[in-house]
Amino acid sequence: VKDMQVQRGAGTSTNGAGAFGASVNMQTEGASMKPYAEFNGSYGSFNTHKETVKVGTGLLNNHWTFDARLSNIGTDGYIDRASVDLNSYYLQGGYFAENTSVKLIAFAGKEKTYHAWGYATKKEMEDFGRRYNPCGEMYTDANGNKHFYDDQTDNYLQKNYQLLFNHTFSTAWNLNVALHYTKGDGYYEEYKDGRSLIEYGLKPFTIDGTEITKSDLVRQKKMDNKFGGGVFYINYTVNRLNASLGGGLNQYRGNNFGKVPWVKNYVGTLSPDHEYYRNKSQKTDGNIYLKANYDLTSGLSAYADLQYRHIDYTIDGNNDKYDWSKNALRPLAVDKKFDFFNPKVGLNWNITSNHRVYASFSVAQKEPTRNNYTDGDPDSYPKAEKLLDYEAGYTFANQWLTAGANFYYMDYTDQLVLTGALNDIGEALTENVPDSYRMGIEIMLGIKPCKWFQNRPTLVR
C-alpha cells in the first residue's frame, strides 16, 4: 500500500459504492522509473519479525516497468501460543505511453494464526498468568498440566488480480477503467469438548453397553469465495467545472461449509470429509454516479454527488448453528433486493487565503453484512441502515498554524448497533435500532514552528 486516506462522514462515490460513515481509500504502489533492489528487516519481542524484499526494473524502452515484492511476518505472540505466520507477494507490470497507461497487478497473501479469541477470565489469569490462552484446551493430566490442541488455527489464502487502464483524450477528458478478481480459500480448525453428536449430523454410538451422545471432536469451518467485477469513471474538466461520471458492477460468490475430521472414540464409519452444514451466497452490486464541483465565484464552490445503487443478495442452505427447539440446523433463506439513492451536496468558501468555511449534507445507505444475517434471528432478518449526515466547519491556516472546528449531526434510521453480545469467535453482534443519532464537534490544531517539527492534536466531543 502506497497511500491510505480516511474520510469522515458519508464517503464520496469515488471511494466505493458502499461508503457508510467513514471510508478508507487505499492506493497500491506506483511504478518506479529507476531500477532498484531493497531489503528491510526487523526483529522484536516474542520472536516478532518482518522481512521484505523489493526489486524493480525501472523504465525499459521508455514504456515498460516491472516490480516485485516478497514479505514475511511472524511472531510467537504475547498471548500463549498466539503465533502468526504471514507470507505475501506483489507483482506489477506496466506499459506507459504519452496519453495511455496499462498496469497488470497480481498479489496474494497466506496466513496461519493460532486462536487467541477465547478471552481468559480474571481468575484464569490469576491462576495461570496474564498470557494464559484458553483456546485449544483439551484436558488436564494427573499432574495438573493442561494440554492444548496444536492445530487450533485460522488458515487463509487469498489471490488478487487487477487490470488498470488510464487514457487521456484531451486536456478536458480522461478515462479510468479497472477490472478485478479475488479468489479466497480458508478454514479455521478447533478442538471442541463434550459436544452433542446430533449437532454435527452424527449418530450416537455405543461403548461397553453405554450409549454415547456427546464426545470430544475436531471441527473445521471452511469458506471458498470468489469476487470479481469492474469499475470506471470518466472525468471532464473545463474552466470552473470538474465533473465525473462513474460506476461499477461486482459480484461475490461464496460457499461456507463445515467438516468433522475426528471424533474421540467414535464407533462407526466417519468419513474424513464428513460435512455437517453448507450454505452458498451470491451478491451482485451495481452502481452509477454523477458528481461535479463548480466554482460559483472567486473562492466559493459548490459540489453535488448523485449515486444510485442496486444490490441482489441471496444466501441459501443451513447455518452452522443448531436449533434445539426444532432438532435441526437453522436454515438460511435470504433473498433480498436493495435500491439506494445517495445524494450529497455541499458548499466551500475560501474567505481569504487563511480562512475557510464549509457545509454539507449527505445521504448514505447500506445493506446488512453477511454476519448480520448469519448471527441474527432467522425469523427477523436485519434491515438496511440509512444515514443523514449534516456537517459544517471552519478552518484557519497560515505558515505555522492550522486550526479548525467541524460540527456534525448524524441522523440514523435502523442503525445496526452493538448489543454487547459476541458470537462463537468473539465478534461483536449488532441489531437494528429504529432511530438514533450522533452529534458533536471535532477541534483540530496543527503547529509547525520550524521545518523539522509539527504537532497535530485533535479533540472530538
Language model features with spans:
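A beta-strand signature from Gram-negative outer-membrane beta-barrel systems
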Residues: V1-E38
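Transmembrane beta-barrel wall of Gram-negative outer-membrane proteins
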Residues: Y36, Y43-G74, I79-A116, L164-T171, ...
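Transmembrane beta-strands of outer-membrane beta-barrel pores
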Residues: G41-N47, L59, N72-D76, A97-N99, ...
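Outer-membrane beta-barrel proteins
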Residues: S42-K50, S71-F96, G136-N166, S215-G229, ...
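Repeated loop/turn-to-beta-strand initiation elements of outer-membrane beta-barrel proteins
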Residues: H63-F66, N99-L104, A172-L175, R240-A243, ...
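Acidic/polar loop-and-plug regions of large Gram-negative outer-membrane beta-barrel proteins
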Residues: G94, S101-Q162, E189-D216
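Structural signature of Gram-negative outer-membrane beta-barrels, strongest in the C-terminal barrel
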Residues: E98, G248-N250, Y276-Y412, K448
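Gram-negative outer-membrane beta-barrel transporters
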Residues: S298, Y409-D411, E431-R461
